[in-house]
């Protein structure tokens, strides 16, 4: 038997403990909050509550009733071959009836009873207080009258006792004094009494006012409760109405129920009348013809075909007005899905897109903008859906409510190639990074932080070669100050101008370091003049840019450059949140064979710690290890500190934002969503075809393609090389990067190259053993490079070999016809004198008459005297027979030429 305490039972049924104890007492059970309640006592309490609410049946009347109707009929259908079969048809109807009146009356009665009880209690309290006040006033009046009578009797007794005059006078004086004193005492008592009455009256008024306010508040609460119940009931009715609109099987409205029953009754009566008239007509027909008429067919005959009642036949009326609805469009959508959302055929959508100038198929993915234009063109209202709600929620769930503190500046070294950027940074770091790069040029973004006497500075060293434009732009976006290194002997070069444009686009201050001032041909003033043409004005000329003359080789003014950087940083007042979850930017990334994906992250805010979960573009992972630029293990990194992190799921793209998140599962979902979105957008862009490009696409079939599989050591090099190779494409030869990636060359790359007939280019990477075996077996061209110049030059040579050669005709000899002879075998033979060059046998010729070409063919016979010869030189006579041409005349000229093939190259 299950027993509960009174307190547990009150929590279970949602009733206050005091209220439940009162109900138990009313039911004849005296309990406390800690007593046990048995099942019999619960049943007894339930019976008491039902009787109290007027329910004596003991069983609750059901508030919802569901009725089901089934109607069966038989339909004869044609089964083919002159036969028919009977099909049983069952029509099911289901209706649900809800008893609302009991619920509404009960709730209304409870609200009225609560308000009535509150009002009665308030009136009862007010009556008790009034009776109490009257009793106190009666007691006070009785005490005053008694004191007055006692005073009068005392005075009378004193007067009667005085015998003589002195005694009388003395008694009189005493009586007067006593009366005077009594009067004074009485006045004092009266004043005290009045003051007490006034105080009591004020207290009673205050108590009365509080009782009235409490009663009014209770009434207001009861009224608000009734209004809320009324609103809740009305909302419930609206919800019920919505349910009726949604599901026509569930009808809770009494009027709708009655109307439906009335319609069913009328339909049934009409069917019965129709059936009765048919049966009577059939009976009369049988009476007239002498018996019933039965249609027979086949061997044993068959039943007559039953006609379906007209009321049961389906009728479809096509709407004349096209339904306009809200169309919800995601970032990408398939054409067929868009048509379904607009309730039109997919061919209509394709027609609209063709009118707008875009070709599409029924299963093609289109972007959000195109779908929006199509839907609005067809008159629908478009609702653009944001599919990155999870991404925004994950990125916004951060605890960065900390105070910002000053941070070190991030300085990017920019400039033209070989102007001394890395050498300047070398002198600052006291290292030799320049010697470590192949060819002495920087091909990666190097991130370093340097401790100086006045503070810490973080440097980003960018390449200066034209192929690394994306790297320089990425460096400018993550920086606070740009130091533009310009050689004093070279002046402003193309990459110098490009670096100025990147700095201005990023909106960061520019400090110009004029390098190589120790050379004899150095001309710093010329550098200032050239830079002024690009709105880079020195401070001494009234501009905003600081110029520092340095020598990276000798270390001249390097300290002044650092002071200038720190001064500019102090003006900028750079701050960042040091505590909390970290966020930064990926400066560089690569695939290490032993450690996996490695990303160089520049922390911009917060503190990145070992073990944090990092979301980085399409990749995610837990930080397994962190190393600084020297290679030492670190456990945390604050703002403006570059570190290498290990543990990501893949190699992120350089420039991606790295953010620390709380949940690894959500980070994986966001990364997968980003990857899927990237694929969808890429597919939508690739499949987009314009009508005006159709003919150019058809003509593109004659273009030769050079397929390349590119692998490099870091992501930045992959981007730079792929961009440079793509720009080499011409109208005749197209460079197609079929595959690119970071890390060593694997067997998968070899299979891809074999399938696409591509060459493999490795930049600072090598192929493993399995890849080398696959490459040798398939005879794939594999080349390794460490300098980007050599890679681009060799690709140019390969493209030049794919170009169609040019052909040039060169005249090698000229002969003048002096006489014409007839030969029975060869026809007309021209006797000629060679005037220029030499005449070769089987060479193509032209016959000129009055310097006009009248025939073009080839030599058939070349003789000197009676001997066949291979060639005849200038100044000799010969006989020439022209193949398939006999109209040779004296004075004609025979021009002999040959076609020379000229090899083309790509500039």
From Swiss-Prot:
Belongs to the TRAFAC class translation factor GTPase superfamily. Classic translation factor GTPase family. IF-2 subfamily. Keywords: Cytoplasm, GTP-binding, Initiation factor, Nucleotide-binding, Protein biosynthesis. This is Translation initiation factor IF-2. CDD domains: IF2_eIF5B (cd01887), IF2_mtIF2_II (cd03702), mtIF2_IVc (cd03692). The lineage of its organism: Bacteria, Pseudomonadati, Pseudomonadota, Gammaproteobacteria, Vibrionales. Residues 440-444 are annotated as: G2. Residues 415-422 are annotated as: G1. GO terms for cellular component: cytosol. One of its GO terms (molecular function) is guanosine tetraphosphate binding. Residues 515-518 are annotated as: G4. Residues 28-44, 101-248 have a biased composition (Basic and acidic residues). Residues 406-575 form the tr-type G domain. Gene3D superfamilies: P-loop containing nucleotide triphosphate hydrolases, Putative DNA-binding domain, N-terminal subdomain of bacterial translation initiation factor IF2, Translation factors, Translation initiation factor IF- 2, domain 3. One of the essential components for the initiation of protein synthesis. Protects formylmethionyl-tRNA from spontaneous hydrolysis and promotes its binding to the 30S ribosomal subunits. Also involved in the hydrolysis of GTP during the formation of the 70S ribosomal complex. Residues 299-308 have a biased composition (Basic residues).
